[in-house]
From Swiss-Prot:
Signal peptide (from-to): 1-23
Biased composition (Basic and acidic residues): 75-87
Bias type Polar residues, positions: 65-74
Name of this chain's protein: Non-structural protein ORF3
Chain intervals for the UniProt region annotation (Disordered): 65-89
Keyword entries, A-Z: Host endoplasmic reticulum, Signal
Residues spanning the membrane: none
Length: 103
């Protein structure tokens, strides 16, 4: 006669999903560890938005100056700049080329 055991694997899996749903995120940035509740969630979302372009091919939509639509801009670290118009050009000046006096 076979003895039926409770479905332990299913029970463990469902309990782990339940615990994960109500727990803190796995990684909390160091500067967010003193917060709780809404402040913790806001701090984590800010940290995710600040680092999104560092590790992924992240694109954001910004308002376009030429039209009423938006323009998609890549904020990936490895992306090239897409400046269409003239940009401000600043020439570097060596400190030895500038005359100054010490009083």
């Amino acid at each position: 006669m076979r003895v039926q055991r409770p479905p332990t694997l299913l029970l463990v899996f469902s309990l782990s999903l339940l615990v994960t749903a109500f727990s803190k995120p796995l990684y909390v940035p160091e500067h967010c560890q003193n917060y709780s509740g809404c402040m913790l969630r806001a701090c984590i979302k800010t940290a995710q938005a600040d680092t999104a372009g560092l590790y992924t091919n992240f694109r954001i939509d910004v308002p376009s100056a030429e039209s009423t639509g938006t323009q998609s801009v890549s904020v990936d670290r490895e992306s090239t700049s897409t400046h269409d118009g003239p940009t401000e050009h600043v020439t570097s000046v060596n400190l030895f080329d500038v005359g100054y006096s010490v009083n």
